[in-house]
Structures are given as C-alpha cells and as structure tokens.
Amino acid sequence: MAAETASGYIQHHLQNLTYGQLPDGSWGFAHSAAEAKAMGFWAFHLDTLGWSVALGLIFLLIFRMAAKKATSGQPGGLQNFVEVMVDFVNGSVKDSFHGRSPVIAPLALTIFVWVFLMNAVDLIPVDWIPQLAILISGDPHIPFRAVSTTDPN
C-alpha cells in the first residue's frame, strides 16, 4: 500500500489522480496534494472522469440490452428493473413538473440512474479498485479514488 501509518493511509485515500498544468508551465500528474492544489483551474481528476464515463457507458449498455430484449408478454428480470426505474422517475416528474416537455423525464431518468450507479460503487470495498490501478500502472503510490460522488469538482 502507499502508506505505512494510519494517517498516511487516510491521506492517500483523500487524493485524486490529478493531471494538470504544473506551476512551471509543463503538464503532468500531481504527486502530492500540494501539487494538485498548485495546478489550480487546469487540474483534471482522471479517476473521477474515468469512472463517470465508465458508469455512463454501463447505463447505456444496460438500458440498450433491456430495450432489445423487451417483450410485451412475459418480461424478464432486467426489463422489470428498468420499467420500475422508468415508472418511478416518470411518476416523480409528473408530481413535481406540471408542464409539458419532452426533455424533462429523460433527463431526470439519466441523472437518477447515473447517481444511482455512482453510489452503487460505494458497495465495492475501498481498496479493491485502487489495488487494481496499482497492478495496472505498476506505481505503488498512485492516488486513485473509485467513488466519484466524493469529488467536489
């Protein structure tokens, strides 16, 4: 692991994989929280961006699979799950938005499912995905956070 002490362990888990413009004008990865802070506006949290895109693709894949296998007769488990989510969001939109707009319900469904999936990543133990990142990168000190909802950026 990246730290020998409990304090170091916690500090390591509070840092994102940050890529940005360093104070000398070059671009690179931040190796500490101070370097990440010095990058200012031009700092990109690659772990957050990567998980956001990956979860968005998972959302699209699941809903596409459900749409392709949808039947009007006897629905399967995935179709039931998607229908429950769509009905829940549709009911919430109808209760809170009384106008007519073709954009509101699909947008609400997208946001609901994306936040649901981002919070579902919390069910994975905190060290598993960073350990996978360490195995892939070969860098035992790589800061990597899998839970995108903890990033205020």
From Swiss-Prot:
<keyword id="KW-0138">CF(0)</keyword>
<dbReference type="InterPro" id="IPR000568">
    <property type="entry name" value="ATP_synth_F0_asu"/>
</dbReference>
<dbReference type="GO" id="GO:0042777">
    <property type="term" value="P:proton motive force-driven plasma membrane ATP synthesis"/>
</dbReference>
<feature type="transmembrane region" description="Helical">
    <location>
        <begin position="104"/>
        <end position="124"/>
    </location>
</feature>
<dbReference type="GO" id="GO:0005886">
    <property type="term" value="C:plasma membrane"/>
</dbReference>
<comment type="subunit">
    <text>F-type ATPases have 2 components, CF(1) - the catalytic core - and CF(0) - the membrane proton channel. CF(1) has five subunits: alpha(3), beta(3), gamma(1), delta(1), epsilon(1). CF(0) has three main subunits: a(1), b(2) and c(9-12). The alpha and beta chains form an alternating ring which encloses part of the gamma chain. CF(1) is attached to CF(0) by a central stalk formed by the gamma and epsilon chains, while a peripheral stalk is formed by the delta and b chains.</text>
</comment>
<comment type="similarity">
    <text>Belongs to the ATPase A chain family.</text>
</comment>
<keyword id="KW-0406">Ion transport</keyword>
<keyword id="KW-0375">Hydrogen ion transport</keyword>
<comment type="function">
    <text>Key component of the proton channel; it plays a direct role in the translocation of protons across the membrane.</text>
</comment>
<dbReference type="InterPro" id="IPR045082">
    <property type="entry name" value="ATP_syn_F0_a_bact/chloroplast"/>
</dbReference>
<keyword id="KW-1003">Cell membrane</keyword>
<keyword id="KW-0997">Cell inner membrane</keyword>
<keyword id="KW-0066">ATP synthesis</keyword>
<dbReference type="Pfam" id="PF00119">
    <property type="entry name" value="ATP-synt_A"/>
</dbReference>
<keyword id="KW-0812">Transmembrane</keyword>
<dbReference type="InterPro" id="IPR035908">
    <property type="entry name" value="F0_ATP_A_sf"/>
</dbReference>
<keyword id="KW-0472">Membrane</keyword>
<keyword id="KW-0813">Transport</keyword>
<feature type="transmembrane region" description="Helical">
    <location>
        <begin position="43"/>
        <end position="63"/>
    </location>
</feature>
<protein>
    <recommendedName>
        <fullName>ATP synthase subunit a</fullName>
    </recommendedName>
</protein>
<keyword id="KW-1133">Transmembrane helix</keyword>
<dbReference type="GO" id="GO:0045259">
    <property type="term" value="C:proton-transporting ATP synthase complex"/>
</dbReference>
<dbReference type="GO" id="GO:0046933">
    <property type="term" value="F:proton-transporting ATP synthase activity, rotational mechanism"/>
</dbReference>
